[in-house]
């Protein structure tokens, strides 16, 4: 199995720290609003990675955090006349509701930043003691000048990174030794949530949170760290700097970054105002369709969010569902053909989780199933791919029985050449969104 490592910009053979086990950390949301489709891309992409690793037999310890203390949370809580805890818990609950609907497997743990404040203070103090960090009027900053290969993850020089960071480095530069230095601890402001630390009351900076939660729960070195491509700098760059300064060990063996969801050629983001929340979208779009749309493009590639793309996803799901509905578990099949499908799917996915190539194999498999191939082994592989994709079909047995009865009545009408009755039943089914197919093996049906 190979993974594209952002740090080296190369495909690398995947060798976990402990054979058969994977330690994986994915940056989660800052919980001040509903997640939008762009946020969901990262959640779904790494859910697919996790599920494929499990399919391949790995035991995955999967950690994804909630940032529940932040300027946006503080401001949102004030505007809503709520505590920061109640405000963030509202959107944590919404996150679970949205991601459950998208059939995302719950993380092994979803730590909250506020649960690790003491550990963050200890982490920062150690950096101060080692002179990797310094105190300035109650704030604590990391000395970037002491970090070896600081800009390597983003594959740029430091000057370029600072120029392209879209204001994210815009802190109180007058308190810093260098404009490149970043905050580990921010001194308390009036009417803001704060904690007591050796340098005075305050709260942690954004970057320290993930380093502390990752090393606390997974250890000093982990296998995979994932997140959106926009996190390469400064967030992941700073995570590496502060973590390796503290531990003296390599922080992450494989860095993975997903591509953006684009709208009219621009990244979907709250700052641009061109976003659609998952909460809103699921009022009008089946969660399966959104899941399929997000899951079936290779994770490193951008995806364009359009009505046509959702329609294409819906049509493809219908084809897959139709094949799955009519799969005969009692049928006999050429198992060597099934083995070829399975091996080809694994070969595609083993190349940096290339689901786009994997889907080409899967669509060929679906066509093969539609030709009458079935049996328990065929159903097992079908189920395994659906699990990786995060698709679950729920067939309403009572409704299915009613449809089958109408189909049988239509067949009897055809046998006695009562074509008017036959057409009447067909039209009645079509009005319910049921399309009939007359095949040499009998009548099959699927939903429009």
From Swiss-Prot:
What GO CC terms are in its UniProt record?
cell surface; cytosol
Keywords from the named record: Aminoacyl-tRNA synthetase, ATP-binding, Cytoplasm, Ligase, Metal-binding, Nucleotide-binding, Protein biosynthesis, Zinc
Offer an example of a GO molecular function term for this protein: mannan binding
Q: Where is this motif: 'KMSKS' region?
A: 267-271
Gene behind the chain = cysS
Per its UniProt entry, what is the enzyme's top EC class, as one word?
ligase
Picking any one GO biological process from the record gives: cysteinyl-tRNA aminoacylation
Catalyzes what?
A: tRNA(Cys) + L-cysteine + ATP = L-cysteinyl-tRNA(Cys) + AMP + diphosphate
Listed name of the protein: Cysteine--tRNA ligase
Q: Where does Zn(2+) bind?
A: 27, 210, 235, 239
Q: Which organism is it from?
A: Lactococcus lactis subsp. lactis (strain IL1403)
Task: Please state the Enzyme Commission number of this protein.
Answer: 6.1.1.16
Q: Which residues bind ATP?
A: 270
Q: Which Gene3D superfamilies match?
A: Cysteine-tRNA ligase, C-terminal anti-codon recognition domain (1.20.120.1910), HUPs (3.40.50.620)
UniProt cofactor note: Binds 1 zinc ion per subunit.
Query: A Pfam family matched by this chain, by name?
Result: CysS_C
Output the InterPro entries linked to this UniProt entry.
Cys-tRNA-ligase (IPR015803), Cys-tRNA-synt_Ia_DALR (IPR015273), Cys-tRNA/MSH_ligase (IPR024909), CysS_C (IPR056411), Rossmann-like_a/b/a_fold (IPR014729), tRNA-synt_1_cat_dom (IPR032678), tRNAsynth_Ia_anticodon-bd (IPR009080)
Q: What is the lineage of its organism?
A: Bacteria, Bacillati, Bacillota, Bacilli, Lactobacillales
Places the protein is found: Cytoplasm
Keyword Cytoplasm included in the entry's annotation = yes
Cofactor dependency: Zn(2+)
The main location is cytoplasm
In which residues does the motif 'HIGH' region occur? 29-39
């Amino acid at each position: 199995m190979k993974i594209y490592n952002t740090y080296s910009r190369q495909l690398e053979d995947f060798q976990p720290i402990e054979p058969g086990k994977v330690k994986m950390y994915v940056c989660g949301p800052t919980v001040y609003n509903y997640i939008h489709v762009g946020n969901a891309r990262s959640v779904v992409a790494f859910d697919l990675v996790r599920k494929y690793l499990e399919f391949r037999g790995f035991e995955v310890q999967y950690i994804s955090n909630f940032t529940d203390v932040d300027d946006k949370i503080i401001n949102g809580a004030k505007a809503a006349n709520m505590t920061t805890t109640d405000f963030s818990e509202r959107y944590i609950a919404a996150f679970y509701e949205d991601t459950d609907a998208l059939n995302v497997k719950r993380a092994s743990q979803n730590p909250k930043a506020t649960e690790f404040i003491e550990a963050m203070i200890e982490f920062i103090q150690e950096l101060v003691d080692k002179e990797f960090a310094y105190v300035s009027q109650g704030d604590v900053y990391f000395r970037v000048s002491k970090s070896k290969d600081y800009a390597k993850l983003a594959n740029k020089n430091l000057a370029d990174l600072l120029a392209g960071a879209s204001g994210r480095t815009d802190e109180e530069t007058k308190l810093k030794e260098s404009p490149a230095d970043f905050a580990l601890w921010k001194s308390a402001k009036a009417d803001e949530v704060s904690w007591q630390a050796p340098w005075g009351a305050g709260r942690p900076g954004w970057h320290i949170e993930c380093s502390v939660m990752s090393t606390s729960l997974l250890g000093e070195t982990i296998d995979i760290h994932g997140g959106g491509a926009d996190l390469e700098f400064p967030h992941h760059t700073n995570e590496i700097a502060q973590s390796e300064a503290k531990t003296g060990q390599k922080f992450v063996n494989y860095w993975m970054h997903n591509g953006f969801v684009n709208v009219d050629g621009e990244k979907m983001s709250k700052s641009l105002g061109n976003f659609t929340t998952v909460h809103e979208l699921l009022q009008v779009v089946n969660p399966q369709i959104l899941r399929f749309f997000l899951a079936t493009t290779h994770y490193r590639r951008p995806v364009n969010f359009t009505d046509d793309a959702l329609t294409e996803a819906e049509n493809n799901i219908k084809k897959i569902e139709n094949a799955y509905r009519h799969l005969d578990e009692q049928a006999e099949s050429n198992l060597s053909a099934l083995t070829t499908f399975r091996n080809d799917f694994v070969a595609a996915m083993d190349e940096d989780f290339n689901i786009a190539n994997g889907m080409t194999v899967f669509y060929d498999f679906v066509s093969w199933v539609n030709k009458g191939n079935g049996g328990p082994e065929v159903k097992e592989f079908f189920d395994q791919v659906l699990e990786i994709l995060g698709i679950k079909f729920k067939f309403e047995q009572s409704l299915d029985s009613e449809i089958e009865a109408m189909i049988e009545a239509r067949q009897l009408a055809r046998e006695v050449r009562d074509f008017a009755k036959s057409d009447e039943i067909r039209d009645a089914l079509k009005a319910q969104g049921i399309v009939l197919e007359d095949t040499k093996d009998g009548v099959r049906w699927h939903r429009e």
